[in-house]
Amino acid sequence: MSVKNTQYYIDLENQYGAHNYHPLPVVLDKGEGVFVWDVEGKRYYDFLSAYSAVNQGHSHPKIVKALTEQAQKLSLTSRAFYNSNLGEYEKKITSIFGFDKVLPMNSGAEAVETAVKIARKWSYEVKGIHENTAKIIVCENNFHGRTTTIVSFSNDPDANNNYGPFTPGFLKVPYNDIDALEKLLENPSDIAAFLVEPIQGEAGVFVPDEGFLIKAYELCKKNNVLFIADEVQTGIARTGKMLACDHEGVHPDILILGKALSGGMYPVSAVLTNDEIMNVMKPGQHGSTFGGNPLACAIAIAALDVVEEEKLSENAQKMGEIFRSKINEIISETNLITAVRGKGLLNAILINDTPDSSTAWDLCIALKENGLLAKPTHGNIIRLAPPLVITEEQLHECISIIRKTILEFNK
């Protein structure tokens, strides 16, 4: 009889699962707050937070309570009927973020697809673009999901190699290049929207220059082009504000949320906008069997309550400043790390090596051995994003682990 240890579970996945991920060799079995435990019982600090889906911490009791109570009452109705949770959730989320309407979905990619459809429909029915000619501007090195349409406007070879033919109708500009965006908008007659991540997460936590977002927003307004913010990873307090756009006072025409909208407890995403834009959608024109289900709504309400009640935006802002300051001290002691960048508790360190090297991966393995889990986003970048419930004492312990690992690795 085989022992059910780490290797057993890794072998099981390798044998029966598609090989479309390259996980760190750790098998997680339990999570609570900022901690996760592997099947052997070793405890780790989680510095990925499921790509910012568990901002509220693992197994938050309030969110668990909402899930278990609602699951025993009513989980799914489809949208063929009204349910007693959806309206309450819609009222709450539109109130928090300042929009008229929300369209509920499940995954982040679904929400991006939904936003694209809404923007195109608005462009034909309100702006008056000739049918089937609307364009959406996107940024190079973007990550908005993995559906066929979304990878159509990715320039990551892993995302789109051998998946064609691709969906047309997208124009690319370099990220953080306001001049390139302005040039594309010189003739805005067939442009429906500009879709942007306020901080590019998968690209390596690339923070644009201050003023880029507000200038881009103003250009869109001037040219009657919708400004769509994909805050699936940056939203829900991760960057020290409820939205990363809030740092520049930008209120998007269309807002995309996901991940931490449920505290990592259930797939919940949302597209928010105003009446003029959302009202182009009519019954039967878009939907989802699971979107807006009673269970999802109960969980999302609880998850949003936790963010507000525990002041997670404020904690992310404070802890993020401490983190970057301390990492900069480590940088002065080593030539392995060249920079730290980020906002709030969405951060990354840049490794002094090439993007195709294994150094970032090897360093993550060493961090794992020392009790902290993180993942490279490229060969020379490591994203560091703990749950937003982390305390200052815990953060300092994590910084000590990172420092020890880097200095030992550098020998």
Regions found by a protein language model. Give the residues of each.
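Conserved N-terminal phosphate-binding loop of PLP-dependent enzymes in the Aspartate aminotransferase
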Residues: 2-411
